[in-house]
Amino acid sequence: MRPSLLRLASATSTQRGLKPNPMALLPPIPLYRRLLRAHRKHLPPDMRILGDEYIKAEFRAHRKVDNPAHLIGFLTEWQMYAQKIEGDQWVGDKLDEQKLSKMSDEQIQQLYELMQAIQNRGKEGGEQES
């Protein structure tokens, strides 16, 4: 076998198959800024205000998290959210039942409060237009 073919053959066997390379995890402050920029660029003003408030509250609440597993999970989910917003893949997207089943009661309560806030803003917006 020629040396170049030998190198090509060995290079493919050392890769991890068809799994995509994991995305690099952004540190908290650059991720926070990216999220706010994504909201400013891709969301309508009323949704942007609600989203910005939610992001600020969540990052404030997780400021003193010591558990690395919780921190990595938190940053990973927010980074995936940023990618969805930037790619306009979020419109009409439903919540994954598997993620919902893994949520704690407190997280489900937060989600319910967020849903109510969105619905109340929709009602207020409808009354103002009349």
Curated annotation (Swiss-Prot):
Record-level GO BP terms: gluconeogenesis; mitochondrial respiratory chain complex II assembly; succinate metabolic process
Keyword Transit peptide: yes
Major place of residence: mitochondrion
Signal sequence range: none
Location of the transit peptide in the chain: 1-8
Domain of life: Eukaryota
Family: Belongs to the complex I LYR family. SDHAF3 subfamily.
Main function: Plays an essential role in the assembly of succinate dehydrogenase (SDH), an enzyme complex (also referred to as respiratory complex II) that is a component of both the tricarboxylic acid (TCA) cycle and the mitochondrial electron transport chain, and which couples the oxidation of succinate to fumarate with the reduction of ubiquinone (coenzyme Q) to ubiquinol. Promotes maturation of the iron-sulfur protein subunit of the SDH catalytic dimer, protecting it from the deleterious effects of oxidants. May act together with SDHAF1.
Name of protein: Succinate dehydrogenase assembly factor 3, mitochondrial
Gene source species: Gibberella zeae (strain ATCC MYA-4620 / CBS 123657 / FGSC 9075 / NRRL 31084 / PH-1) (Wheat head blight fungus)
Taxonomic classification: Eukaryota, Fungi, Dikarya, Ascomycota, Pezizomycotina
